[in-house]
Amino acid sequence: VVGRNEGCPDEWMREKKTIREHLDYKFIMALEGNDVASNLKWVMSSNSLAVMTRPTCETWFMEGTLVAGYHYVEVKEDFSDLPETKAQNLLRELYEYYIEHPEQAEDIIRHAHEYVRQFQDKERENLISLMVLDKYFRLSGQQ
C-alpha cells in the first residue's frame, strides 16, 4: 500500500515512488482500483514489463483490445494461477521466467510500444476528437 494507511499492516506500507524511480524496475504492476490502472499508459511506454490482471475498465486507451502475453503479462485477479497465493511468490515466478526468457520479455515490451504509438499521432488524435464532437452535436440535436 502506498500513501496513507487505511488499516493495512505497517509492513505493507511503502514510501511513494516517482515515475522515474519506477522505471528502474524490469516489472511494474498496473492494477485497477476503483477505475482503470492509471499508470498503464506510461508503463507500456517504458522498457519495463506491465504486469496486470485482465482489464475490466475501458477508456480512450482501449484497454479491452490489449492481449495478455502480447502487450502485458497477465495474472489472475486472485492470483489463483499460482501454487501459492502471495504476491511475492507471483512476482518471484514472473521475474525468474522472464529473466530466463529475455526474448519473450523484449517481444512483449516491443508490442506494448507499438500499441502506445497509435495514440502518439497528434493529427490523428485531433481528428478523432473533432469527429467525436461532431457526432455528439449531431446526436444531441445541437448541430
Residues of each region from the PLM?
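Catalytic donor nucleotide-activated moiety binding site of glycosyltransferases and closely related
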Residues: V1-K16, F61
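Catalytic binding pocket for nucleotide-activated donors in carbohydrate/polymer assembly enzymes
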Residues: K16-Q143
